[in-house]
Design a protein with these regions (language model features):
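Pyridoxal 5′-phosphate
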Residues: 1-133
Length: 133
């Protein structure tokens, strides 16, 4: 029987081109890029090169490109970052009730720290009903 994988929101297969590009770092180039020894400096150079490539691809400045360890960490950064950057404009954040736990838990944390969270209900197809407003 042919396998059908349906959990792409959790993880996805790695494209061969990506694996080929990453394999040297999995095998030998795994130094801590914050370290001062040679293997760390090599890792930092590779990380900087990757950052430059991504920045060029999305037409941004390399200083605006951040790498995270996972989607949950990226979600946390995004929500905390927006909340902090815009706190002078208000403390009300609106999201949906079906967000990933990384967003929902961050929202709960922000509520405990003075933010007002609104969790919009969604329709069976996942869309938001404008009548709720």
């Amino acid at each position: 029987m042919r396998e059908v994988y349906l959990d792409y929101s959790a993880t996805t297969p790695v494209k061969k081109e990506v694996l080929d590009e990453m394999l040297p770092y999995y095998m030998d180039g795994f130094g801590n890029p914050s370290s001062l020894y040679e293997k760390g400096e090599e890792s930092k150079a590779a990380l900087d090169k990757a950052r430059d490539r991504v920045a060029k691809l999305i037409n941004s400045n390399p200083s605006e490109v951040f790498f995270t360890s996972c989607g949950s960490e990226a979600d946390n950064w995004a929500l905390f970052g927006v909340a902090d950057a815009l706190k002078e404009k208000g403390n009300h954040i609106i999201t949906t009730a079906i967000e990933h736990h990384a967003i929902l838990h961050t929202g709960e944390f922000l509520e405990k720290h003075g933010y007002e969270m609104t969790y919009l209900p969604v329709l069976p197809d996942g869309s938001v009903d404008p009548a709720v407003f």
